[in-house]
Every structure is written in C-alpha cells, then in structure tokens.
Amino acid sequence: MLEKLVDSLWKICRKSKFQHMTPIADAVDTFCFEPLHTPSSPPFVRDAVDVKRWMMLVVIALMPTIFAAVWNSGLQALVYQSSDPRIMEAFLHISGFKSYFSFVSQEIGIGSVLFAGCKIFLPLLFISYAVGGTCEVLFAIIRKHKIAEGLLVTGMLYPLILPPTIPYWMAALGIAFGVVMGKELFGGTGMNILNPALTGRAFLFFTFPAKMSGDVWVGSNPSRIKESLATMSSLAEKSHFDGFSQSTCLQVLNSTPPSVKRVHIDAIASNILNLEHVPTQDVLQTQFATWAESYPGLTVDQLSLEQLQNFVTTPITEGGLGLLPAHFDSACSLTEAVYGIGKFSTGNLFFGNILGSLGETSTVACLLGAGLLLLTGIASWRTMLSFGLSAFFFAWFFKIMSILTTGNAGAWAPAKFFIPAYRHLCIGGLAFGLVFMATDPVSSPAMKLAKWLYGAFIGFLTILIRLINPAYPEGVMLAILLGNVFAPLFDNIALKQYRQRRI
C-alpha cells in the first residue's frame, strides 16, 4: 500500500505542471525505500549502507540522549513548579538510584514525568523538522536537485541543544537560519563548513541572549518557575544565599567573581563537609588563630553559619579572609560546584539529574551514543579522544599554574580554577558536543593528524572560554564553530606533513 502511494506521488510529479515538485517525491521515495538513483560520476561503490542508513544510525545513537532529555526535563519541571519545599528538599538530597526512583514513584509518578517531558521536547522537535524541512524543500525546488538526508540528523540535534523554555517562534527562526545560512548558503548538504544546528543556536545566543542563558533551564514557563521558587524559599524560611534557585554548574562558575579565592571555598567546605584537611589548611589556621582571639573556644571547621560568614568576610589584617560580604553567596555556590555537594554531586552530573539544555545533561547517555558511533565507524575516535584529553589537560593546567604562580597551595588564586578537571567533562554541553557535534564528518577535518589537531583545539578553547571569558558561561558551541572554520587549515597542515614523509 505504501508503495502504491509513493507511485501515485511520482505520477503526479511527472506531470508537466508539477515537475518542479519532483524533489519532494524523490525524498519520500528515498525515505521509505532504497533509493533507485545511482551516482552520476565515479567512484561507483556498491554498499548496503547508503547515506540514509548512515543517518539512521546517528538517529539511533541519539535515542539515549533523547530519552534522557524527555525524562530529565519532565522531572525538573514538575519538581521546580510544585511550590512545595518538602518535595524540593527531598529532590535535592537524593543519593543513589534506589532513593531516586523511590522519590519519582512516590512523589511525582513515572507517567507524569514522561508526559511533562514530551510536552516540552516534542513540539520543539516538530518545529525543527517542519521549518527546517520547508527550507530544504524550497532550496531543492529552486536549485532543481534532490533533497538530501542531512536534515534527518540536524532536525534532531537542534532541539537537543536548546533550553526547554525557548519560545516556539524563536526555535523556528533558529533552525531556519541554521539551514539557510549554515548549509544552503554554501551549496547544501556536504558542502557546508559550519555545523548547521550549532549555527542556528549561535544565532539565537547572540540575537536573544536573555532567552538562551540565565533562568531558562526548567519547564516551559520561566515566570511560573520563578514564582514557585520564591514561594518554596519563603515557606522553607531560606535566606538570600541558600534559597532555592535554578542555577547550573556553569552559571555558578561563570558568575563567581575573581575576588572569591580558593581559601574562601576551602573555609566553607571545611565546615559543610567537616573535612579534617583542605589544601589551604595552613593559611586557614594562620588567619583563624588571629581572628579567633575574640572568639575563644572555636575551631576553624566547627563554625556556625553566622560565624563562618564573619570569619570569611573579616579583613585580612584582622585575621579574616577578606572576602567582600556581597560575594559570600557566590562563594557558597562555587563551593558546591567544586566539591560536588548537593545538586552538583558527581553522580548528578554524570547521570543527568541537573539543569541545562535538553540534550546536554546526561553524560552517560552521550557515552552510550558514542559507543554506537564508534562501533559503526561513523564518528572519529581521534576527534573524540583528542577533544576529551585536551579539555582535561587544560583544566588541570590552569589549576596547576594557579598554584605555582600564587603559592600557598593556590590559596589566593581565583577559586574557579580549582574545579576538578574530570568534572569539566560532565558539566555543560562538553559530552554532547564531543560525541555528536565535533564529529560531524562534513564540517570536521578529513586527515588523521588534522582530527587530532582539531579535537585538541576545540578542547583548549572550551576550557579557555569557561575559565577566562567573563561573557559566556559555556565554550563548547563557540569552540566547535571556530574549529569548523579552522578545519581546512588543519587538513592543510596534515597534508603537508604527509607529503614530507613520502618524499
């Protein structure tokens, strides 16, 4: 029956007045069945895996990430808009799989989570395919060429890199810009130098920054979430710096001023975690000995919240740590991010129980997709490995240089440099970008050496933007797009090296 419908569509399009619609019939035929057309020029390769099957493997690799996006966005939305501080407290203090699924089943409901997540993700997916597909069809008709299968993956990647609160009209504008300016402008699928999905996101990021960063990570109605958070903080009698918020780990990292030093977060951590020894213990003890002369009987790791704030914000000349009082809340938030406390625990970051763009939250889901892409040979392991190693190395490098240049175990170096290197791999969009964006075969280099250089370049830029640039909390998007621009240069370098070895 399906074959008859496709044949009927071909008959209609072969009529003279509908011949310009032939690309649509060809696209439907190719999607449903094995394409009948053969290459018009060499090489002629007979293979069961054509471009359509190749793209379908990428779609299958995206399935774990899509499920994680639906599940996490639905759960976060229901918890954050509940206006119930008891539910929020229970959610933030989850530890382990057993307590996690017990909380979901007893407090929220699995069906409710999936339904809420689908309400957020599926409309964005539909818009991506509808608007992006329309642009593809129009250009195919105008240029009189076949509709390529590239949108099958681009249309699925695009909504996964958007915040859940993005307005629908804005999502449509972004995918249209990405397809037209990022791909069709260069000649269509296979000739674009930039990743179309990232091009669309970059356009939205620079055109509508307030809708792409800040408090945009929960539910589909930011105003409702803000009201719910304010209600929960009020009912729970939370202070201004320990109230409920929807800040992400990268937002905390980016918004922390340079005046927050390592010694400040170590002082807070020693009281929250009851650590017997922190890296800056000697500096803490020296300063505390002077400060505690007015408070006999106190120890540096057994302070009340008021005493801790007093010690950290007292001027250095009086025995304190010299932090501006207005920055104490930032220091508390960064302490959680650096030491993996509460919602920023390593488990939450790895498995995806965090806030962020729809597809970037779950590192383990991205790794499952990476396994399939590597197993089938679709993605380059060289790009993935060099990207990950480069990001890890430079995160570690900034930490070591901070210690060496300031002394005292980096006590007076900016605290943001001391987030563990492995945690950089689990926060933001690094895992998603590493697996699905940087490995785009069209916009990435082709030579083996070039792939190593390309991945290392992206990893370096990602960490540099995260830690040094105060304007952008995340560096993955810009790093990959810049890597796309430099990809021909990396190929040229690799080609010269290859020729020199052959001579």
Curated annotation (Swiss-Prot):
InterPro entries: NqrB, NqrB/RnfD. The keyword Nucleotide-binding does not apply. Its cofactor is FMN. It is found in: Cell inner membrane. Pfam families: NQR2_RnfD_RnfE. The chain crosses the membrane at residues 55-75, 120-142, 160-180, 361-381, 384-404, 417-437, 452-472, 475-495. The modification FMN phosphoryl threonine is found at T248. GO terms for molecular function: FMN binding; oxidoreductase activity, acting on NAD(P)H, quinone or similar compound as acceptor. GO terms for cellular component: plasma membrane. Composed of six subunits; NqrA, NqrB, NqrC, NqrD, NqrE and NqrF. This is Na(+)-translocating NADH-quinone reductase subunit B. It comes from Chlamydia trachomatis serovar D (strain ATCC VR-885 / DSM 19411 / UW-3/Cx).
